[in-house]
């Protein structure tokens, strides 16, 4: 079987051409200097915060390397000034200056007068560091150059020795992304599984997870479909890193960063209409109250059908966020979110003879009316930050979240050998969970001789209380104990009633998981060229698990150490080369805290170890590229002892290795790109079951995957987008008996902005109406890709 479908050779040729064009292009036009006088109201604050507020009030793209602003404060600006004058006053006394770039954006740099000798003794003077975008309403392409989650502090990606892919707010907006599946297609090395039609499932470097999701760096691990209505960016932080995130994250984690108050009085409202009665409205409003309080409210409502027969989604949400400056050194941000998602659980299509069953993609298999799913979430978050002075600061974050989740489904099983009938089964599963987490971080930047240390020490405490209940579906009109039926493949739906009740083996349990962890990280800068990162986390993770059906109680406590070590070499300021080693662990309770049994409770957690080499290049202040090669080993996998089948044993169970290439940003004025390529190989290194044998390829992992999106603005009023997503074949399960063929999908968009406050946007998914299979959960739960779908969005800014 070819690795790429017939149309993919074109994609293979297109990627290097696009990358070459991006890396060689330079801005060619410089706008006139900004001389318009504006009224600025910015109170004294930490410099990074003041710069963000200035950029929002000025409506400019403003960039600054995170290390330059660390520990510095601004006296603020309260005057009517031009943008250059305002920046000059804002930066007074900091030793920094703002410089306008040819594309009209601004970058904060060291002042031309040397402030201190070069750390490596090679001289003193101006060193231009790669910028980190802190805020800007102007389109900066799709580049984001920093992450607050990957290192537990705001660190430039260039100084982060780990592969990180970021989907920015601009890319989310331009593609009208609404789900993590949409975003993950533009993250090299990150894929999706179907998630049984009721949840996000990420596949990162060969490891599938339903729990490795974070919101503003805090755990958000219940199974549901997340929305982007209040999201500023999405980050894939690849490779295990328990030093930062704690348990899990064997292949990495997905972090969503929410929209925060930007100390401006503005807002936007949007309405979308599209194929299959797609209807959605969203609102984003900001308001400043004096100089000390600001609020931002995001809200959303959606009522949409699907190309799949009988499938729909109804969702709504609201997220108010309040920021309060208690003093020039202290701030508090409080947020609340209410989120509701009601939909029909769609398990997709079955397979036949090693391929997805050939039928119309709209065909539903099972009973749509007996397949409701809902997720109701209420979450409260509070962040307190205080500048201690002397390069030190403290931050405390708390998140309390209640989750109420149920999914019920009557879904397809195997197709009969003659291809005439399909089996249908049913069950439901309910989860109620309360998460309470508190993180306290103390950060201190200090020089020790010729070495600069950026120290982060912290404490994390958490409790998760979970109740799980599962019931089997019985087709009682055919018999009290009938749990499956056979339907003709020509009409694989029925309205037979289903009765749900517990079987002898269905889950009914209660669990409490307690986390207590301390960690220490040192980001060392030895010179302008050499850096290192070293950190370690000690965690006590205890689970108390009760089987309500048997009254059996099981407990397990793990106390692992999780180190992280990396070295960074920067031969020139814009280029970083790094080597890193990190690891993580997964307790026997499993990612959803419901897998602890008497037989596995005696075993140590699974281990994930990642070794990585990479390069990150800031091609221009608005365009970046990266590359990474890695090997990830999964060990302590529990399998049946082949000699004594009554016992279990631990083996080194899986190896993943690969190459990831990533490019994001603005090539030149008007042209933005986002894309990447990944080569992956993930295999089992030991037999784990009769259908999971040594040498098998891990499910949902393509050998090749490619994504590339371009937006070009022809004028201030008109723009267009064009992109492709391509993937080689994948297996639906680790049995390697069912193959989802590779595919290439082309998407497009047109943007019309008649004036500064109003925009129309048309997005076309699957422009050429390609038939393909997007993902799978198992051999007989395969999700077909959508046919051509159009969505029109009207947006009004005020």
Give residue spans per PLM region:
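Acidic, small-polar-rich N-terminal luminal/periplasmic segments of exported/outer-membrane proteins
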Residues: 61, 128-264, 613
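Outer-membrane beta-barrel translocator/receptor signature
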Residues: 229-232, 243-320, 326-330, 378
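Acidic/polar loop-and-plug regions of large Gram-negative outer-membrane beta-barrel proteins
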Residues: 302-306, 318-387, 400-433, 479-507, ...
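Structural signature of Gram-negative outer-membrane beta-barrels, strongest in the C-terminal barrel
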Residues: 323-327, 433, 452-456, 460-464, ...
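Face-selective signature of the C-terminal outer-membrane beta-barrel domain
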Residues: 380-403, 426-546, 666
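Membrane-embedded beta-barrel scaffold of Gram-negative outer-membrane proteins
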Residues: 384-399, 403-411, 577-578, 605-686, ...
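Gram-negative outer-membrane beta-barrel transporters
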Residues: 631-633, 650-735, 768, 793, ...
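C-terminal beta-signal and adjacent terminal beta-strands/loops
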Residues: 726-733, 751-798
